[in-house]
Amino acid sequence: MGSKKHRRSRSRSRSRERARVVRHDRSPGDRHSRNRSPVKSSRRRARSDSGGSRSSGGSAGPSRQRGRESGHSSDSDRQHRNTHGRNRDSSSDDDYHDKKKQALKKKHNDEKDSRSRRRKSRSSSGSSTNSSRERNRSKTSRSRERERRRRQSRSSSRERHRDQRRRRNSPERDRDRRRRSQSRSSSSSSSDSDHGGKSTQGGSSSKEEKKKQRDLMKALETPEEKRARRLAKKEAKERKKREKMGWSEEYMGYTNADNPFGDNNLLGTFIWQKALEKKGIGHLSEKNLKDRNKHIQEENRRELQKVKQLRLEREREKAMREQELEMLQREKEAEHFKTWAEQEDNFHLHQAKLRSKIRIRDGRAKPIDLLAKYISAEDDDLSVEMHEPYTFLNGLTVTDMEDLLEDIKVYMELECGKNVDFWRDMTTITEDEISKLRKLEASGKGPGDRREGINTSVSTDVQSVFKGKTYSQLQALYMNIESKIQAGGSNLDIGYWESLLQQVRVYMARARLRERHQDVLRQKLYKLKQEQGVESEPLFPIIKEEPEKEQPISREAGSGEEEAGSSSQQADREEDEDRRSRRTGGEEAERSGRSSPEEEKKGEEEEGEKDEAPEAVLTEEDLIQQSQAEYDSGRYSPTLLQNSELPLDTHIIAEEEDLQRLLLARRQMQVTGDASESAEDLFVRRAKEGMGGDEAQFSVEMPLTGKMYLWADKYRPRKPRFFNRVHTGFEWNKYNQTHYDFDNPPPKIVQGYKFNIFYPDLIDKRSTPQYFLEPCPDNKDFGILRFHAGPPYEDIAFKIVNREWEYSHRHGFRCQFANGIFQLWFHFKRYRYRR
């Protein structure tokens, strides 16, 4: 214990001696020797301030300061060393540094000795180590406190010295500033007087004023303000440089001394020497490297500009493509809308035609229905309409004709340009008939007298001029009349020629419809002959040059018969000519009133031309007369046949039964306006009801040979009519679901049948027909379904798929006999796979 106490007292005495040496080592002369001249002191002050700023910028917290103290150096010591290094003239400073170094070395040695002793004491006993640690900690804390107080006293003494120096130097600085400002103002005034002699009130430029103010501010500012201004300027330069380098606001406060990266050359340009050597440009100077980097940056900038231009061009092209696609899409949509509009028009046209058919079938047809049927019959079927279409206007009132005009407009819109000439001609004729009827109503005569009631001179002249002319002739006449009206003249009867021009349109429309009607008749007759295999002959021959009679072998023999035959033929021809002359004469008498001699000459010339050239168009009356003449001549008399000459299956109808059927058909036509359907047609139509898209007609019949019936001698056996359907569909089992889909479906299979057998003339109505399912001898997968009814019907059989039937009515099974129809409907069972 005594040794430990002795050691502790020795260490305490050493530390006290060291503190005395540090305190009393410097003499007052040495301390005052630090006060140098004002210029040197100001320079030293600036350096110390800049160094202080650096040290403050790069200094860390208290932990780092303690680390520096333990590392035998501190910021304050470094500062003292720098200031004493600059003032190497004073010997006192050097002595002070030497003494301080010796004291520090001694201190370090003592600390090392104390550490070694502590280690030894730790090894000797654990309790003594703990106490020694506490003592060492207290010693170090006390020494640190002493050092801190020492620094504070030194800094306060330095501040006092600085204030004293400022007070001494401030009057001298003020005098220097005043002298400088006076010399500058005198020089500026002399320069102004030399250059123009301008007065000071005129004033210098704004730049000179700013410069003067800046100079004045610099002359009057204190050293602290000057230092702050220069630091701010330097900081602004560094900030600008950093902004140019691309630094963000986060890194703007970093400096070479203060940055988290530990980079002492943070603000400088980084040069990767290894990369430069690898590229082979390590020998270049800094200026060349800068030029090279600048050149590379320019190239990159140009490349970026090119890339930007290409991108803009691509965007422009993309916008153009999108615009083109949009235009194409609009065109497609317009086409779709057009097709939809056409479909809508076709639908309305179909509905209008359907309404017309229904009205015609019910016997309440309107004029537009008859016209629509006439114009559609030209293309649809081979039915022949013998009358011209304008004959449907006979007997109509003004209201009916006005309704007809509206219906014609609707058909013209719906047909979209089809049959325009036909509807225009009908419109012209209808408007003319309406005007005639209104004139008759105004004159007080009914529509029955309209043909005979026109007594004006213009109408008789018009009828005499237009009688028997073709469409081309009427068109030429129309052009002549129009040119005559346009030419004018003093003796021209404008009213007559205008009425003539007004009526010629109507006659042109009638002539065009008549010629169209004749063309349609010729085409349909030609098609009928082609279907029947008849050799084509001239259509509607009127005048045939009779070939010269064969020279009789003996004129005496059979001369009486030839004379009789020739006389009869001549008589027939004379009668035909008389009828035609009477008809044409009557028509001319009705139509012609008074005519001028010029028009009579024209008519005679036209009749002469007609006599020379044979007519190519026949009217309905001409055809009737021709057929009547042929019938009278005996060419239509059928040959008489005996019963033995008839085939065995010929069905003979008695005259009374035929007459009754004819009278019944006539009564039905008078009541409904259309022939009713037969019983078998009704049966077929009833069997076709409800036929879906997954059903098809099934008419494959199996022949039954060697079948004899007991009632065959009493009734003639006949086969019944039938209308059968087969139901097909897809079976979506596991295999089909795996290998097929809705776009590529599996093959259809038969799922059921619907048999409709017609027995309208069954003798025994109480006995219902029956069906029998028999196996097929050729193939076990098929069966034969046979139907048996009774007299007068034979059995009938069909070959079907041999599968198990579904007899539940829920699955569509039906077996009934009603209204002369035997129905057998069934579906096959579906087998479900179950584990």
Curated annotation (Swiss-Prot):
Keywords linked to the UniProt accession: Coiled coil, Cytoplasm, Developmental protein, Immunity, Innate immunity, Neurogenesis, Nucleus
Taxonomic lineage of the native organism: Eukaryota, Metazoa, Chordata, Craniata, Vertebrata
PANTHER family from the UniProt entry: POLYGLUTAMINE BINDING PROTEIN 1/MARVEL MEMBRANE-ASSOCIATING DOMAIN CONTAINING 3, SPLICING FACTOR CACTIN
Protein's name according to its UniProt entry: Splicing factor Cactin
GO annotation (BP), single: innate immune response
Disulfide bond positions: none
InterPro entries, sorted: Cactin_C, Cactin_central
Record's compositionally biased regions (Basic residues): 1-13, 33-46
Chain intervals with Acidic residues compositional bias: 605-617
Major place of residence: nucleus
Keyword Transmembrane on entry: no
Subcellular location: Nucleus; Cytoplasm
Listed GO CC annotations: cytoplasm; nucleus; spliceosomal complex
Protein family according to the UniProt entry: Belongs to the CACTIN family.
Highest taxon listed in the record's lineage: Eukaryota
Composition bias, Basic and acidic residues: 14-32, 66-98, 132-146, 206-238, 543-553, 578-604
Species, as recorded: Danio rerio
Pfam families listed in its UniProt record: Cactin_mid, CactinC_cactus
Protein function: Plays a role in pre-mRNA splicing by facilitating excision of a subset of introns. May be involved in the regulation of innate immune response. Plays a role during early embryonic development. Involved in the formation of the anteroposterior axis with important roles also in neural development.
Disordered, as annotated region: 1-244, 537-617
